[in-house]
């Protein structure tokens, strides 16, 4: 088409802006909205927030522009060397005569790049605590089950069939896209929508389900917005994405993970027949226990009746004994009173004159007083004698009295007592104490003596 255009316009003259606009028109009209896969290189993010980079493959390069609003929607960091798939429109930039791809959507393409993004996102969300929430228990018999999945395909049919087969209950389906650019947002909005329903319409449990697929097919279930919605849900969530070997980030934020959508239905409701059998078994156990309890209490009543009859008989006997004792007391009381009166009369005859007793006690007190006075005088005289004897002995032992008899006390210069020739041999100055005073003596010579 470009060749035909040039041939038809061979003789026409264009200005630079005219030919640039024509080229831009041809590019945009002939290519429109396209997808291109390649490797990012030369990434630059301007202060305006726009990103500029090249998409390369071997030696071919395609310039790309990602405007700030689009860049803000990309949920992972861009790096040189990252393999991506870009959706957008081709256009030309008249400023330097080049064509470029204006980015509308950008997704990781290579498995390695996707796993790197997934691991970085997982580590960041785990650090925030989004995978460590307190799990909400799945109710035993939910009255309503919310299912978030695609309305077409085998998944929704399997879930409905399995629930109806096990324990029929009301199912509320919230249809969403389970693959594609905006499916993560749709699923997150569905979770929030179920949580915002009135209590009467709100399901007891939510199943988020999708069939198996590649990591690219399941990528929406790694969306950060979806993970946060699952974390914030007040309704317990069962995640059933892919097969048993498939793990997505919603599995870590959900309250329970099911290996398959069918297993999620089994987690949501019990088997009705098994439940009925269990209830019947419990009913039999309850009836048997009730029957045994009734028999036990009947036997207790019989035993209590026997005890009551025995106690009645016992009380009657005791009452009879009490009555007989009362009668005997009434019969014996006159005799007892008469006996006591006789004793009182006898005591009256034998009682002693108080004046005689007083005279006797006065005389006895006089004798005791005289005896105590004499004993005290003797004891005092004995103490005085012993005191005088001890005083004489003490005076004889007083060294001052000894000094008066012509003896003296000899001390060294330091005041130490000298009691022998040996202790005085090394002393030059002596202090000699007599009975009437003390003198100091200085030794000049030593005269030998025995």
Swiss-Prot record:
Record keywords, A-Z: Cytoplasm, Exonuclease, Hydrolase, Nuclease
Top-level enzyme category: hydrolase
GO biological process annotation, one example: DNA catabolic process
Role, per record: Bidirectionally degrades single-stranded DNA into large acid-insoluble oligonucleotides, which are then degraded further into small acid-soluble oligonucleotides.
Record's catalysed reaction(s): Exonucleolytic cleavage in either 5'- to 3'- or 3'- to 5'-direction to yield nucleoside 5'-phosphates
A molecular-function term among this protein's GO annotations: nucleic acid binding
Record's protein name: Exodeoxyribonuclease 7 large subunit
Family under the similarity heading: Belongs to the XseA family.
Disulfide pairings: none
Enzyme Commission no: 3.1.11.6
Assembly and interaction partners: Heterooligomer composed of large and small subunits.
Superkingdom of this protein's organism: Bacteria
Annotated source species: Rickettsia felis (strain ATCC VR-1525 / URRWXCal2)
Predominant localisation class: cytoplasm
Stored InterPro entries: Exonuc_VII_L, Exonuc_VII_lsu_C, OB-fold_nuc-bd_dom
Record's keyword annotation contains Nuclease: yes
HAMAP family, sorted: Exonuc_7_L (MF_00378)
UniProt subcellular location: Cytoplasm
One cellular-component annotation, GO: cytoplasm
Lineage, highest ranks first: Bacteria, Pseudomonadati, Pseudomonadota, Alphaproteobacteria, Rickettsiales
